[in-house]
Amino acid sequence: MPAPQPFLPLLFVFVLIHLTSETNLLPDPGSHPGMCPNELSPHLWVDAQSTCERECTGDQDCAASEKCCTNVCGLQSCVAARFPSGGPAVPETAASCEGFQCPQQGSDCDIWDGQPVCRCRDRCEKEPSFTCASDGLTYYNRCYMDAEACLRGLHLHVVPCKHILSWPPSSPGPPETTARPTPGAAPMPPALYNSPSPQAVHVGGTASLHCDVSGRPPPAVTWEKQSHQRENLIMRPDQMYGNVVVTSIGQLVLYNAQLEDAGLYTCTARNAAGLLRADFPLSVLQRATTQDRDPGIPALAECQADTQACVGPPTPHHVLWRFDPQRGSCMTFPALRCDGAARGFETYEACQQACVRGPGDVCALPAVQGPCQGWEPRWAYSPLLQQCHPFVYSGCEGNSNNFETRESCEDACPVPRTPPCRACRLKSKLALSLCRSDFAIVGRLTEVLEEPEAAGGIARVALDDVLKDDKMGLKFLGTKYLEVTLSGMDWACPCPNVTAVDGPLVIMGEVREGVAVLDANSYVRAASEKRVKKIVELLEKKACELLNRFQD
């Protein structure tokens, strides 16, 4: 029968086309399974989660669970692969993170559409445990440091915290001798340009909270919304979180506001010199206002938490403001309706007016620089670090957490007080200490790094003069700064106490394996003119040689 003969070539062509189309669906050699976010949906572009730093040219440059995708910088970055709900078949066996390793610091295994993937941690504990990291920044706690390391694709480790002592002095000098500081003169902790002010928007409206901060180096800004949960979500610049966007300049914009969006939004700004946290209260109001409060009825009862049992669940997606004794200010709580009434306030300002008596604690306010140009050195108290720190005040629109001297700041605010330490006793007087020491210098302390676990630390000294140097060649090398190792230090009451004097010091110590070392027997005193002159005279008269001959 001749009829079937033409059918065979057609069947062969159909099978060939089918096989070709099937092979096109297979991934290219070296490519990883899954899709890029914008391939799955045109609205899911790779955002700044990659920070445009993890560049790649193909999937082979990324981890097995990642794809090389176009990012907002016009380049390509490694990001977690996405899978459509009706896409590649998922193995019938349940996916598990068991045995799946996430080598990047701050990343955890998560199951994404049936596959284990590594995701950067985006929630951290609310309790502070300040951590100094190897990138020179201070983090709110260890979790924040790990999350930042994952975000930047780095490895960060904990280092001893630095104490910057070079500027400003504890008290300004006379006006005629004090130079006007500039914001870029020295490392400065973050400070706000303007004090945070409460905002209120109607349902469906847009709110903008701007954490406008100064500091040197420029501070990094993150946001979080305070909640009653153990962990808060960290919101970073150039990312979207539901109806919330954090811009590249640290501005939080909330679109289509809903009642549940009301609350305290906390800005955290940090740099190598310090850390700042400021609360921005946001109230969301219903357009159809409920019954107005009778102005003749005191609202103090509204400040207290509900003690009676309420029938039924809380009002869905509705929050009210009440006084929180732990914070000392107002915060949002789920609205509970008992007997048809809800206890609480619609706005943060109404709650503060009714429940907070007096001007409030000035020491709890963030440091505010202000927008003017009349720069002045000032001191502010940090309730997080529990210490006073310097900042530059512009001369206007600050707040009460603004002191002319460190002493006045410490007198007004709760700086931890420890019993006074006994004065460090010198094992030898000046002449004998000079002869027993390998070096004697005059210098100003610029930085101290404490290492309590090793009972030591490091002191960095700006050299004014080298009086004696038997082993390091400081004058020959023209050394301007000297790093001195502190050995056997009890940091509760350190001896010698290198931080006891603000001005120049006379420092004498040993040299061990080419390193300048101070221990409990080393000589450290204020560099008075009389003391320095005495050392020079002893060296000129070669008193140490005579002393050695006498001892021999």
From Swiss-Prot:
Q: What sequence ranges are listed for the domain WAP? A: 29-82
* Disulfide feature: 36-69, 52-73, 56-68, 62-78, 120-150, 124-143, 132-161, 211-267, 303-355, 310-338, 330-351, 363-413, 372-396, 388-409, 421-493, 424-495, 435-544
Q: Give this protein's Gene Ontology molecular function annotations.
A: receptor antagonist activity; serine-type endopeptidase inhibitor activity; transforming growth factor beta binding
- Single GO biological process annotation from the record: negative regulation of proteolysis
Question: Which is a Gene Ontology cellular component entry for this protein?
Answer: extracellular region
Q: Where is the NTR domain?
A: 413-544
Annotated signal sequence range: 1-25
Q: List residues of the Kazal-like domain.
A: 112-163
Glycosylation positions?
497
SUPFAM superfamilies attached to this UniProt entry: BPTI-like, Elafin-like, Immunoglobulin, Kazal-type serine protease inhibitors, TIMP-like
Instruction: List residue numbers at the site (Reactive bond).
Output: 126-127
Q: What is this protein called?
A: WAP, Kazal, immunoglobulin, Kunitz and NTR domain-containing protein 1
